[in-house]
């Protein structure tokens, strides 16, 4: 059968079949072959879509993995202008955690990764662009916790008030607070930045999130930069090393 042909071709066992044949699992070599096969199938599907799009008069599909809550600003600040210049390009955007982002890129499901934390297996990726985003505090204009009476705030100002963190920046924030012997009162840790901001909009806490200087927030919120040079995340745009990009991704 095909399994025996493959095992003979690669000179190794690909499956472990437990006694009785009721349980089968991949060997390490089998896992490697499985992942490579998935990538090959992904490339074939991608090529088919590009050919179909080309025949239909389109330029192709741009597939991007993004960290949670990043797509809105990415669309507003970059993709909208890109679309006006290349109106026949289609888009597939996936907002997923870093682990899944890494998997999507390596499997060829997406070609470009935009992340707010280091990708897993970082040696397999090439970073084309990076920038720093500082952590900011967002609070309601009528907040009982902070006042809009100075241009910035200090880390000390955040002690003993309910904080709402986005998960992407929580580890960094806790680390800096620990080093500074500050013990924050964290009310919630949220998967997305938008969820953290929602608490601040309802005036139930102060949101701590990463934000570029150009990002706009609801009119009822006050934005203050936290004056601490340790409180920033590095945003990166990465591709898989040594893998040729599709024509639309190269554009």
Where are these regions (language model features)?
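Flexible hinge/capping segments at coil-to-helix
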Residues: 56, 124-163
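Hydrophobic hinge/microswitch elements
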Residues: 97-110, 116, 168-224
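A short LG(V/I)-centered, amphipathic sequence patch enriched
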Residues: 7-28
